[in-house]
Amino acid sequence: MKSNTNIRVLLVSGLILIFIFLGIKFEFINKNNNDKIGINRKLEFSYFTKNNNNNNNNNFKQDQLKNKKDKRILLKNEIIDTNIKKNIKKNNQKNNNEEIFPNFISRLLKSNDDMEIQQFTYRKSHYIVQFKDHINDETREQFKQFLINTDIVLDEQPYQSHIVNYIPHDSFLVLMNDEQSNLLSSKEWVSWIGEFEPSNKIHLNYNEKSIGLPVYIKLSDSTNSLIQRWENTLNSILTSYNSKVKLTLINQKKLKSIVYCNDESSSQSSCSLVSSEKLVYQWISEQSESNYIERSEKFQTANRLSPKAIFGTKDTLVNNDRIDIPLRGKGQILSIADTGLDGSHCFFSDSNNPIPYNSVNLNHRKVVTYIGSLHDNEDYVDGHGTHVCGSAAGAPEDSSLAISSFSGLATDAKIAFFDLASDPSNNEPVPPEDYSQLYQPLYNAGARVHGDSWGSLSIQGYLGSYSDDAGSIDDFLYTHPDFIILRAAGNNEQYSSLLSQATAKNVITVGAEQTTHESYTTDALEYSNFETVAKSTLNSLCQSFDDKYCTYTTAQCCTEYSTVKGLSGCCTSYIKNSYASIFSSQPELYNENNICSFSSKGPTHDGRLKPDIVAPGQYITSARSNGANTTDQCGDGSLPNTNALLSESGTSMATPLATAATTILRQYLVDGYYPTGSIVESNKLQPTGSLLKALMINNAQLLNGTFPLSSTNTNPSNAVFDTFAGANFVQGWGSLRMSEWLYVESSGVKPKPSRWVGIGELGKDKKASNWKEYSLSTGQNVSYCFTYKPSSSGSNSGGIPRIVATLVWTDPPSYSGAKLNLVNNLDLTMTNTESEFIFYSNSGGSSYNGTKGTTLPLQDSINNVEGIIYTPINTKSEISFRFIIAGTNIPIGPQNFSFVFHGENGEFDWADSCMQCNPDDTQPCFIENGVGSQTCGDDYLWGRCLVQSCNNNYNYNSISDKCSKFLSYNYIVIIVAGGTMSLIITVLILIKYMEYKENGNKFSLKEFFSGVLGTGKNVSGGGKGGSGGSGSGSGTLKDGTIDDGTGIHVRPKPKDAPVTPPDLYSLLSPFIIEITISTACSLVATAASILQPYYIGQIIQDIPTTKGIGDLRDQFIIIFLLALLEFVFSTISSWISGIVNEKMVMRLQNKVFRALIAQDMGFFQKNSAAVLMNVLIVDTPMLRSSLTGILLSVSVGICKFVGSLVFIFTISWKLSLAFFATVPVLAIVTQVQSKFTKRLTRRLLFHNSKASQHGQESMVNMHVVSNYCKQDREIAKYSEQLMMVFQISRRLIINNTFAASIKWLMVESLAFIILYFGAYLAIQKQFTVGLLVSFSLYIGYVIDSSTTLFGVYSSYVQCLASATRVFLILRSAPRKRTTLEEEELDNIIDTNQDNNNNNNNDDISDSSSDDDDDNNNNKNSKNNKTKSGESDDSSSEDAEYKKNKNKRNNGKMTTKLSNSPPLVGEGIDNNNNNNNDNNINDDNNQQDPNNNNNEIDDDGDDDGDDDDEGEDENNNNNNNDDPNDNNGIEMLTEKQLRKRKRQMKKEFYKKTGISCLELNLIPSAYTELTECRGEIEFKNVSFCYPSRADVGVLYNIDLKFESGKCYGLVGPSGSGKSTLLELISRFYSLHPSGGKIYMDGIDIAKIRPSNLRSFVTNVHQHPFLFDATISENIGYALDNPTQEDIIEAAKLANAHEFIQSLPKQYDTMLTDGGNLSGGQKKRIAVARAICAKRKIMLLDEITAELDPESEEAINKSIKVLTRGHTVVMVAHKVAAVRDCDKIFVLDKGQIVEQGTHNQLMAKKGKYYRMFAFSEDDDYAPLLVL
């Protein structure tokens, strides 16, 4: 409990420290921190100039304009001069230092109760932040990061601080709190911060015309509770005004508000909506969530001959056929949103497919989707939408019909239609309040060109105002760059009368021009609805003159207009004739070169040029809707057809034609017609919306006709507001004339135009498949160069050369309340070789020649369309043109753009080279998420953009040559550390899978995880612990593994089976949770260390450009925090792993000790205690250290290796590949090293054990050594063993040192090469010095981690050496011997039964292929000849023994029982390949099982030589090198002998120094005894010791010990007396064929040994005493003995008197009994047996070595004990057995006599001969005869 508390305290303390330092970091970073800008960005242009007839380079720098730079903040409602208006208050540095940290701590410690106060104190508001210079990517990202970081510290919820919009000049509208604004004011790149006044949010008129209309509120942020909270508050305020407000959330950024009178109110007060609205919107403007408020505007709707004008040239018209207009939009989908679409009209109907309503069907011939909410596909009568769609793409299914001549322009295109809800009062459209809901489904349907012929006009008048709707449209186009929208300019005639949606920057705004004169004289008269004009006049007469006209009809007007002239205006025939007369008499006023009088004109409110283009819009004849009538109004398709056709005028009619033309243009590009005029697969291009807009504008033709401004005069269309060369506010850039460049190669009918068109660099050296539009950031520029040559003879020119360049970009949406709406400003300039002037776009011509003192021009800073039109002066010589596009101010970048150039009447082409710069000039270049730089080369071209630095949380990725975010700290921890943990878990799963495969079970992940966590495995026989838990219960698990209470389970396997990873995992499984936590902590620490070199390199990189040490504070704090993180988590990891190590060694040693204690006595006969203790004390800790060390080393090594590898590859993949060239060599060296390490480690452990064994034997037998004065001999032998250990250790050291030296040499050499090559790359500017330093540090990490990982394999090999010895003991522990081992499943028994030896046959072929599987049982095998081939019949007794032995081997004892598995005990081993562990099959040499070193070449090589090493003192055959000893090898050749020695050496390397038996499982069902009568019976019992299975001890014993009687066993030494006693106690197990022993009629093999021994006590002839008190030794057998029991037992054993004479009496400590005499030890042992009070007492020579008095006393005690007990005693003295109820006489393992003393004496047999000489002396020993 205390440990858990300490852990929690440490973890909590660590977390508090981390958060405090994070707080300090963010506070101090943002306090008085002069953040630097990585590169001083300067805009530099290079120009062609002429000086003394030489071409020199002259730089024009925009820095010259800085002194006159406009720093005003331009809002619609206010212009803020930041030079005059004061900044917000700035706390001085001292106050910042003193106040920030306490404020942070107080916030950190605030409780939830303080939340309301906190929200009030740190409530967010809108601020305007102005930057000192133009905003670039770096300063913008720094600003964003500042807001994020300070938000984390301040924990501001629910709104995040963020940038709302850009406001000119150089300012951001920002949502943040006051404390953030104070911190921000210290930034070097900030010049002014001010609060955003609520009045600047409101853009409303409160007049009767607009009052009550919906108002839209733009939101910076919103929550689900915002609307309800606002509405409740406002309605409570409006109660006194008798009005209410209804708020509706349109989306997360937009809210609709309607204020209305509360008719349900009982109040008698009047309702004033003006006052209510002022109050409501003033309150909303003061809320931090709102940022813009404007009134909703009323929406209004704004071709047989039109295509002839659109596809004509500036001078001629074309025919409306497939020759002059070959492309009609095939494969394209255009979209339209309007009042409805009459699906029954023949222009749209499909006989095979219905119109898909709210779904998409690309198989419909014309309408792929119809999206609407009215569940119809119809329009109102004479509907606007049907007419518009017909103009764009309508066409009958049968093209042969006459009506098809009135088809739309893009007849092959399909339509995606959005049905706008209509106002019932006037049929005007009502679009969705969220424009993305309109455009997104059309975009999803496949449309990429869209037309809108409707819009709204500001209620405030003709302002050309940029509304929120315009911002929404710009936003959609900005986020969908491959989409383009065309919008009608409006039909309001006046200047600045544009519809508000048409003021959007990114749309193509379409004005109206007149159509061909033919249209006026034919179609206009036929299909115009003059009835509507007449009724309008009649209505005016009704209202203005006389009520009687209210009932007039147009027919009456025609009848009476001759007498009443005023009625002519309502007569349809008169009106038609008047129009016909006017049209025919004034063709110059009615043709395609004139502007329609009604077309709305520019500019916008901020002076932007609109419209962009004009298209035919007057008397356009197209489809006519018949409303809900579903009859096809086309009839038979004949003409004229006034039911199906209608002629209308307006920009609404011009917009669909321009939309169709744009669609055809897109088809031209998508199908690959550009630039050859025919389809080329590699030329297929997916154009952006800006490119389509640029092409449309670039190829527009400025009209030079007239336009009527009023009813009394006309004006030249290019003379008014002619601000730009080639553009004005009336017609924009001119009228569409597509034929000038939309060339389609045909059969030579149409000649190739004289216009050459260039798109970016497409076609110069790039194909469409790999071409991409450029993007720019502030301070960057790009150049395009072209050449002009005069037209060659015969070329199709015939005109004046002319060039037109157009730049278009899709600008981010503007803040609607800004005075100027352009956000990103690009500028286009031109130079050429025939002029020294610099030409600026949209400036009216040349205005600057570079002369000192000349007034500098001001480039266009309000339009996102810029153009230059130039006519060469010298048309006879070649001219080079260079167009420069500069990123003047890109606050939200980078900004993509489209550049289009065309040249007329000459030969134009790309220049071979384009001089972009001066040699060695440098400029910043755009790098995503970073800053790059590029250098000008000798070819006057900018070089590759190299990463100079990356933004925070980004790093340079050399593979992609970008700044990649995945290298941020969070991603490092997640990807690398998390990936490593995943890998470790995967390996564990694989190990468990291997375990299940080895067991033959089906793998289950559920069982695996339950096994790992110790929660799911069932245990039979033990209930406290699962396989992986830490419980102390014992039991058999479902997978057959044994858990004995230590938590460590070992699966039963053959003892010599190799140790596999699942076996090793079984040792770790109880601690897997702790190890996992330790590993995870270690991985976090490693991940923190991985990132440190990156920041170190960053510091080094920033040093040259840093002004003060404070600028590096950020990086230093991060490094400190990372180091702290590494320290905390590495400490936790070390702490946990250290505890786990000790727990593991404790449990593992406990496990091994349990396995040793559970062994049968034969095991201890074959193995030295010193060797076993060596395993327990040395191998077990070594195994533990290796296991836990390997897991942690692998985890940390992989994490560090992979993490560092990611960095070095991203920094420089070239250098990384150089490093990896050495990996195979390092792997080979490690493999060779591991091979020798494995051999030498196993030999080292073996000889260490031998040395320990010899030392212990010498000290235990010190009496013998001293008695025979052999101290020097023992010293020499021990020294020899130590020398063996030293020599092997020396080889191991040499092996490891040599391998390490090779690795070190290679790695260091490689490091030098990498450093050299890295320095070269840094000099070549391929990457920076900081990156080189980081790379070098990471190389060190990689080297360190790779060395660790390679070393892990060596550790694993050493681990296997220790594991082999440990598992040899664990696997050989008998199953269910004691309560230490629990029951095994029957299927495991059956599995082991199948593995038993099957060599019990006489087949010679089987024995010849025998590989040490059976060395003892096949006596008839030819492989088992005696060494000399002599007979064994040397004596009758030997013959009898051999006979019995052969009988065993050939009789039933060698018969495999089919019903039960053989019990492999110390008797006969049926799977006894372990009885002679070191025996190598030799036809003539049956070696001693204890001989481990026969003919072993121990020099560590394979040459068969013997270096006199490795000979064991227990080896009795070490002289086989004697040339006279040819026994067994005389028939081998030299080659065979070497092969044999190599085989013997391999066997030697497998030596463990431990000899174990392969003990199979005892049947799982035990009989539990609760009481015992004490009756014992032997039936045909035969036995031999496992250490000498070829020597029998007992033969066919049949005897019975009855309860309550005393029995004696006498006979010569070695006759089997003591063995009988040990068999009763089951210290040894009988072979199933070796007879049975019964207790109370129950086979003792079926009684649990511990249960059996609870009724039996055995006193050995050699007493064993423990290092404990005398009292503890006597009471050892009882769990809680009383002092009375102990004293009574001592008295009965005649030990009480001498114990009482000792100083401490019963509390005297016995150190191995060394302070007692032999007799005293014997009496204490007897007392221990007496104290045990067992039913059966087995006494083995307990009176030996006692004086007569003591012996007599003990004999008397035994007589007392026999009452109710069964006593069996072995004795060599008459007195001990004289009074026994029955005596058994044994000789050579057989019972030769039995009876009472008198009966045996009367027989005069063996007993008599033994007793005859001691008849007079009861205490004389029996004689052995």
From Swiss-Prot:
It comes from the Eukaryota. PROSITE patterns: ABC_TM1F (PS50929), ABC_TRANSPORTER_1 (PS00211), ABC_TRANSPORTER_2 (PS50893), SUBTILASE (PS51892), SUBTILASE_HIS (PS00137), SUBTILASE_SER (PS00138). It is a multi-pass membrane protein. It is an enzyme of class 3 (hydrolase). Residues 1075-1358 form the ABC transmembrane type-1 domain. It is found in: Membrane. SMART domains: AAA. ATP binds at residues 1611-1618. SUPFAM superfamilies: ABC transporter transmembrane region (SSF90123), Galactose-binding domain-like (SSF49785), P-loop containing nucleoside triphosphate hydrolases (SSF52540), Subtilisin-like (SSF52743). InterPro entries: AAA+_ATPase, ABC1_TM_dom, ABC1_TM_sf, ABC_transporter-like_ATP-bd, ABC_transporter-like_CS, Galactose-bd-like_sf, P-loop_NTPase, Peptidase_S8/S53_dom. Glycans are attached at residues 629, 704, 781, 849, 896, 1018, 1295, 1424, 1580, 1715, 1755. Residues 1388-1402, 1465-1494, 1515-1529 have a biased composition (Low complexity). The chain crosses the membrane at residues 971-991, 1071-1091, 1116-1136, 1189-1209, 1210-1230, 1304-1324, 1327-1347. Pfam families: ABC_membrane (PF00664), ABC_tran (PF00005), Peptidase_S8 (PF00082). The active site is at residues 338, 384, 652. Gene3D superfamilies: 2.60.120.380, ABC transporter type 1, transmembrane domain, P-loop containing nucleotide triphosphate hydrolases, Peptidase S8/S53 domain. Residues 307-727 form the Peptidase S8 domain. Residues 1403-1415, 1495-1514 have a biased composition (Acidic residues). Its EC number is 3.4.21.-. The keyword Transport applies. Residues 1386-1529 are annotated as: Disordered. Keywords: ATP-binding, Glycoprotein, Hydrolase, Membrane, Nucleotide-binding, Protease, Serine protease, Signal, Transmembrane, Transmembrane helix, Transport. Residues 1576-1813 form the ABC transporter domain. In the C-terminal section; belongs to the ABC transporter superfamily. ABCB family. Multidrug resistance exporter (TC 3.A.1.201) subfamily. This is Serine protease/ABC transporter B family protein tagD. It comes from Dictyostelium discoideum. The lineage of its organism: Eukaryota, Amoebozoa, Evosea, Eumycetozoa, Dictyostelia. The gene is tagD.
